């Protein structure tokens, strides 16, 4: 994760737990793409810390649509309520 932005500790823990649920052969690229996207969102808004909404937005942005179902299930299993950020169940 980038040096210019910091991650909220709880958000970072949830991010790493989400990454663990991704198939091993996709983990590396998923971790890189989603973390860069979350940090990019924060940077564009001139903030310094990645929060849960940024992480959720990044996962929805970087995950191919066909995998949104399993991704949503993984988020629900970790107690991440993506619906509060405007995404449908």
Regions found by a protein language model. Name each.
Residues 1-89:
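Non-catalytic accessory segments flanking P-loop/AAA+ NTPase cores
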């Amino acid at each position: 994760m980038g040096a210019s932005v910091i991650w909220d500790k709880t958000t970072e823990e949830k991010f790493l737990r989400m990454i663990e649920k991704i198939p091993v052969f996709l983990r590396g690229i998923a971790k890189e793409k989603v973390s860069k996207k979350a940090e990019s969102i924060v940077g564009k808004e001139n903030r310094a810390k990645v929060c849960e909404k940024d992480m959720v937005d990044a996962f929805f942005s970087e995950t191919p649509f066909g995998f949104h179902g399993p991704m949503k299930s993984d988020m629900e299993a970790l107690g991440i309520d993506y619906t509060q950020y405007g995404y449908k169940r």
